[in-house]
């Protein structure tokens, strides 16, 4: 009897008789295959086998559930090919001859083959234990380390109907979804000892070290034979043959050398060689912690990374507390140098982190951490999910970077990719065991046609283990403070949000196109993260506006802390393609405030997406080629530059002021970084004969010109100082996290927007020529007001048309539906922020006048 949980099929564990029969059949298959010889080391011994307790099945498969080895043996999609025929995506070219050339591969005599297989069979039937027992043995030390952290049990999932009564019309779908989540939690509790233990797969799979040796385990149910190869055994496939259990888990134990040293030296290259339905292939272990690409070599090599205890990086600084208002500096280590080169973790730590701190941000979000073979993918075509990118340095270098950020009081968010994976077959997960349905959906459902990548099967038990463990690994091992989950919209819908326009109709969110398995995974990972690390921050990239996306899981939501408010950046690009006269201020305010009540958003005017080649930064949209010749302060600016500098400041401030509860800026855009991002690339020859021109491998536009923002003789410096003033204004007044927000004026004729946020009053005049004297604005608090931020101040590249020391006194009488008002001067293309002050208010807030910088900066 087989039962399912949202596409996850659970077979009953096979009996001993079934096991022996399966093993006999497996051995007979290998005998008939005339396979490669895998001889056992004389000193090899088994440390006990483990079950892949719940094997992987495609949630869209209609076949009966059996053991993973029975289901996947010989399975291959019509579209798949042998390892030698696979072509790596974009910059990685498969060459099996090159890869296999350094391994001694021979066909064997029947007697030798039989002897080897008999030894393998004996190992496969001895001492089997479950993961639950393994984790129980480790629980004492782990509980000491994590301080007895517990993941709370599921709630009833009903509170979402009180939060959003419109969800009642979709109660069947939402109750079903929460029911699948609860059942999955129960199955994990029953079979794995709980979500906390389930998420420690990296302590079972991959390479694990004990006092007596190294154990290597790999889930590869489609493989017919496997061997561990590497520098340590001269890439001899006969030396270290792996044994398999009935759940597709391959294992080998390598005892320490006679002198007590590990059998695999730290820094050695390693791979797993498998005889698969697609042929013989060498793969990087799926749980590898470090991989490198030697110069001139394709593909990457896995590296056994286990430095001596005295050489391992020891964290010195505690994690900072979760900031009240989240202000994120989005960054990419490789392109963070002012020079045209790939930068390092160490240089980013020493040069960029202090800059981020000085600018006033309290969080740094780092892209492209997970290893990716194709640099120009911006880190989104991940090949090795547990390995930090070796382009930038070692794992210990990354730890040092994060530790330094913590010392500076910065939380560190990782841009994590669980929405898809690279199509690379030799250094990635694709076709890992020779089948296309191991980690991913089989057939066309497993391919993202726009991203040219593979799509995970979130209904697979082992995929859940892999991804949940991956999220925890980065929190535990590297002490990241949270994540920005990439491509969540693609995960939550089977159409992946492609060629679909979300209108806000709830039927778009809760129907047949919703991937319930994926949503349940997101609920699991958010429960895991928040249970183990209550201070962690989790941001989801969702463009659809999924209701209850940022509602706690126990209440029936998906569980994110923040949603990226992606529509705002698109709106700015749309407006920048028009004349100022065609802008509608009501359209601007609607887009900025069009978000779900009670669900926090991180807003941005532009991120890395808008800066990529083929698009333009906001600064380049505004000033175009004039940025090359007219940014020196001692040279007369063109009208285009004057307009660009003014609107650049206004766009960023109103985005922060109205758009969300958190703010994000991509590195360099704080000072209006010119041009675009173009990663080094060569010509691409497409199958249809077309050629996509490259840039001759140039790094010229794959860097950040921080020197421009620092140069006081350039107008970029004023833009950078304004951005710093914005951050300090929020740090002082906390307006982004205030529940009070009221737009009192959006005048299409005057092009004026006035709104209250927290205790501040914002006045924006978007008119291109009209300045308004004695312009009355409404306010809710009577008394005296002062200017606390003025975009027209000369320090920010403005014209100093306002007296920032002036005081403004309110008069009674309703205006713009406010109980009182006062008169201001509103120059064209300016943004001014006012704050109510007491007569005896001589605290630090008064010192912020007139520019919003910290007192020591004035």
Curated annotation (Swiss-Prot):
Tissue: Mostly expressed in roots, stems, seeds, inflorescences, flowers and leaves, and, to a lower extent, in seedlings.
EC number: 2.4.1.18
Region Disordered: start-end pairs: 38-125, 139-158
Compositional bias segments (type: Low complexity): 58-69, 77-91
BP terms from Gene Ontology: amylopectin biosynthetic process; cellular response to fructose stimulus; cellular response to glucose stimulus; cellular response to light stimulus; cellular response to sucrose stimulus; glycogen biosynthetic process; starch biosynthetic process; starch metabolic process
Active site per the UniProt annotation: 486, 541
Basic and acidic residues composition-biased segments: 139-148
Entry keyword set: Amyloplast, Chloroplast, Glycosyltransferase, Plastid, Transferase, Transit peptide
Gene Ontology CC annotations of this record: amyloplast; chloroplast; chloroplast stroma
InterPro entries (UniProt xref): A-amylase/branching_C (IPR006048), Branching_enzy (IPR037439), Glyco_hydro_13_cat_dom (IPR006047), Glyco_hydro_13_N (IPR004193), Glyco_hydro_b (IPR013780), Glycoside_hydrolase_SF (IPR017853), Ig-like_fold (IPR013783), Ig_E-set (IPR014756)
Reactions performed catalytically: Transfers a segment of a (1->4)-alpha-D-glucan chain to a primary hydroxy group in a similar glucan chain
Transit peptide: 1-37
Molecular functions per Gene Ontology: 1,4-alpha-glucan branching enzyme activity; cation binding; hydrolase activity, hydrolyzing O-glycosyl compounds
Keyword Nuclease: no
Expression induction or repression: Induced by light, preferentially when associated with glucose, fructose or sucrose treatment, but repressed by darkness.
Pathway the protein acts in: Glycan biosynthesis; starch biosynthesis
Top-level taxon of the source organism: Eukaryota
Functional note: Catalyzes the formation of the alpha-1,6-glucosidic linkages in starch by scission of a 1,4-alpha-linked oligosaccharide from growing alpha-1,4-glucan chains and the subsequent attachment of the oligosaccharide to the alpha-1,6 position.
Family: Belongs to the glycosyl hydrolase 13 family. GlgB subfamily.
Subunit annotation: Monomer.
The protein, known as: 1,4-alpha-glucan-branching enzyme 2-1, chloroplastic/amyloplastic
Gene: SBE2.1
């Amino acid at each position: 009897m087989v039962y399912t949980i949202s596409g996850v099929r659970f077979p009953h564990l096979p009996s001993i008789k079934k096991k022996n029969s399966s093993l006999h059949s497996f051995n007979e298959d290998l005998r008939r295959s005339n396979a490669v010889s895998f001889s056992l080391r004389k000193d090899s011994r088994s440390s006990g086998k483990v079950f892949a307790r719940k094997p992987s099945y495609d949630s869209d498969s209609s076949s009966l559930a059996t053991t993973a080895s029975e289901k996947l043996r010989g399975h291959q999609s019509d579209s798949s090919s042998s390892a030698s025929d696979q072509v790596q995506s974009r910059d990685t070219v498969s060459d099996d001859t090159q890869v296999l050339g350094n391994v001694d591969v021979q066909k064997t005599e029947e007697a030798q083959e039989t002897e080897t297989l008999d030894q393998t069979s004996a190992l496969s039937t001895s001492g089997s234990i479950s993961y639950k027992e393994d984790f129980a043995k480790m629980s004492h030390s782990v509980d000491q380390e994590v301080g007895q952290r517990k993941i709370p049990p599921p709630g009833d999932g009903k509170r979402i109907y009180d939060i959003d009564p419109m969800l009642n019309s979709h109660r069947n779908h939402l109750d079903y979804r929460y029911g699948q989540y609860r059942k999955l939690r129960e199955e994990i509790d029953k079979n794995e000892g709980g979500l906390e233990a389930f998420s420690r797969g990296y302590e079972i799979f991959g390479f694990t070290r004990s006092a007596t040796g190294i154990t290597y385990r790999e889930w590869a149910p489609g493989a017919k034979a496997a061997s561990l190869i590497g520098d340590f055994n001269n890439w001899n496939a006969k030396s270290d043959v792996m044994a398999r259990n009935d759940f597709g888990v391959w294992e080998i134990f390598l005892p320490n050398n006679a002198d007590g040293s590990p059998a695999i030296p730290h820094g050695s290259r390693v791979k797993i060689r498998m005889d698969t339905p697609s042929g013989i292939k060498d793969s990087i272990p799926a749980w590898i912690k470090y991989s490198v690409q030697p110069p001139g070599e394709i593909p990457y090599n896995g590296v056994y990374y286990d430095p001596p205890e005295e050489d391992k990086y020891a964290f010195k600084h505690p994690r900072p507390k979760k900031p009240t208002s989240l202000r994120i500096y989005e960054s990419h280590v490789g392109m963070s140098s002012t020079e045209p080169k790939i930068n390092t973790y160490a240089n980013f730590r020493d040069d960029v982190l202090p800059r981020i701190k000085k600018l006033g941000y309290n969080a740094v979000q780092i892209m492209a951490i997970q290893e990716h073979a194709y640099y120009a993918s911006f880190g989104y075509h991940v090949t090795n999910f547990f390995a930090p990118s070796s382009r930038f340095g070692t794992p210990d270098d990354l730890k040092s970077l994060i530790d330094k950020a913590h010392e500076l009081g910065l939380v560190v968010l990782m841009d994590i990719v669980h929405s898809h994976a690279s199509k690379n077959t030799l250094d990635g997960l694709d076709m890992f065991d020779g089948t296309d349905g191991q980690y991913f959906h089989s057939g066309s459902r497993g391919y993202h046609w726009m991203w040219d990548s593979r799509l995970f099967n979130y209904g697979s038990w082992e995929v859940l283990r892999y991804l949940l463990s991956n999220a925890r690994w980065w929190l535990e091992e590297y002490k990241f403070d949270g994540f920005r989950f990439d491509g969540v919209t693609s995960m939550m819908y089977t159409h992946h949000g492609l060629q679909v326009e979300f209108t806000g109709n709830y039927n778009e969110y809760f129907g047949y196109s919703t991937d319930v398995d994926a949503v349940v995974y997101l609920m699991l990972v958010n429960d895991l993260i928040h249970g183990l690390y209550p201070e962690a921050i989790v941001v989801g990239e969702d463009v659809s506006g999924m209701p209850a996306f940022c509602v706690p899981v126990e209440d029936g939501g998906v569980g994110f802390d923040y949603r990226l408010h992606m529509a705002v950046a698109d709106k700015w690009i749309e407006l920048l393609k028009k004349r100022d006269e065609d802008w509608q201020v009501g359209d601007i305010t609607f887009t900025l405030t069009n978000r779900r009540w009670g669900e926090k958003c991180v807003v941005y005017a532009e991120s890395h997406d808008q800066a990529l080649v083929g698009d333009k930064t906001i600064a380049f949209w505004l000033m175009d080629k004039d940025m090359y010749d007219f940014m020196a302060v001692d040279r007369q600016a063109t009208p285009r530059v004057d307009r660009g500098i003014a609107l650049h400041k206004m766009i960023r401030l109103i985005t922060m002021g109205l758009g969300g509860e958190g703010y994000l800026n991509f590195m360099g855009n704080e000072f209006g970084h010119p041009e675009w991002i173009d990663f080094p690339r060569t010509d691409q020859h497409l199958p249809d004969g077309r050629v996509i021109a490259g840039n001759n491998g140039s790094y010229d536009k794959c860097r950040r010109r921080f020197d421009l923002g620092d140069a006081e003789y350039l107008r970029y410096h004023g833009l950078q100082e304004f951005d710093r003033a914005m951050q300090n204004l929020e740090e002082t007044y906390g307006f982004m996290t205030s529940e009070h927000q009221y737009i009192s004026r959006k005048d299409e004729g005057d092009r004026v927007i006035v709104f209250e946020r927290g205790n501040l009053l914002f006045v924006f005049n978007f008119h291109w020529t009209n300045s308004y004297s004695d312009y009355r604005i409404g306010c809710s608090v009577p008394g005296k007001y002062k200017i606390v931020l003025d975009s027209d101040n000369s320090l920010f590249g403005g014209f100093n048309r306002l007296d920032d020391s002036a005081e403004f006194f309110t008069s009674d009488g309703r205006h713009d539906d406010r109980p009182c008002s006062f008169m201001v001067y509103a120059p064209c293309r300016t943004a001014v922020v006012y704050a109510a002050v007491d007569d005896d208010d001589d605290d630090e807030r008064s010192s912020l006048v007139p520019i919003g910088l910290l007192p020591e900066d004035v």
